[in-house]
Amino acid sequence: MKTLNTRTGLAAMSVALMLALSACGGGAQAAGESSETTSSAPVATASASASAASTPTATKASASASVVAEPKGSEVVEVRAADDTNADATIAKQAAIKAAKRVVAQDNRLLNAWLHGDFEHTSDEELLKFVAPEKLKQVTDPIQSARNDIKNNGGVFTGNVTIRDVAVTDIFTYDYPDGTSYPYSVLRVKFCEDWTQLRTPDGERAVTGPDSTATVEVSVLRLQDGRYVYNGSRELGTGCASS
């Protein structure tokens, strides 16, 4: 029985997963951050095509309408803040933080769905609810890798990749190509990613050794239409402080 490509391929899928949208340098300016510290390395950036859209205010009402209750498996939902995040206010900051954590939670749910063989909601149209348009290929490639791993291993994986200790470590204001900007529009989210419960079809651990846990940082971007999308990730190191 072949094991999946260990963390180099599988976890790369999570840390690459829908992933991967290279690091954000560009128009991000520090606006505020949580009590946790983080590396000074850049996070992912969104180009003009990612943010070129209508710019409705992300109000509480519109946010509530856009959130699907308890999405399952590979279902992709738009993530919007539960309060208006256009203003530079504490309530807006907290709403943005919660939205960023929901993006990370959806990323994890989709990863597990694909590893379990659920590819129902992987059309370009559906994936674009969650990923910037110019990053689509960096999402579809890992999905194909999951399909290949399942085929090569003779079946789907069981168990789940889990995450814990999720915390927003940095928040920035993003300057969009048209000259507009919104506070709390780029957020870095750090967490522990744990692969110890994932099993191959024959019941063996899919990932073993020190690579079975990792500290990961995800960048989340607020698009001009109010959506918060997965905007890249990187592995900060193997193992987790809490492990």
Residue positions per predicted region:
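Structured, amphipathic secondary-structure segments that form assembly/contact surfaces
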Residues: 121-243
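C-terminal motif of bacterial Sec signal peptides marking the signal peptidase cleavage site
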Residues: 19-23
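Bacterial signal peptide processing site
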Residues: 25-28
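Bacterial N-terminal signal peptides that target proteins for export
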Residues: 2-13
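Compositionally biased, low-complexity intrinsically disordered regions
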Residues: 62, 71-74
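Extracellular mucin-like PTS domains
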Residues: 35-67
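Core segments of small alpha/beta cavity-forming domains
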Residues: 74-158
